[in-house]
Amino acid sequence: MGKSLDKQFGRFLRQQRGQESYAVFAKRLGISASTLFRLENSDQSVTLGKLEDILKRLKARMRDVFPE
């Protein structure tokens, strides 16, 4: 993904995580806590397949992350 899309996705993940710990939230998403941290901070891009998997686990839609 492009940098601006990575940032939008990172903000979305932070918002969804709320006060939940990285470890607990990452487990729900099927990723490691370190991967979650990197995604939230736009230090790692996500593949389309992993994005779809994460959204499914959160019961969210693509337009929830990328409204425009």
Feature locations, PLM:
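Residue-level signal for the short linker/turn that defines the boundary of a DNA-recognition helix
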Residues: Q19-S21, V46-G49
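Short alpha-helical DNA-recognition segment
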Residues: G18-R38
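Short, conserved catalytic or interaction motifs in soluble domains
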Residues: N41
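DNA major-groove recognition helix of helix-turn-helix/homeodomain DNA-binding modules
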Residues: T47-V65
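A short, Lys/Arg-rich alpha-helix, primarily the initiator
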Residues: M1-G18, R28
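Phosphate-coordinating loops and pocket residues in cytosolic domains that bind phosphorylated ligands
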Residues: R38, P67-E68
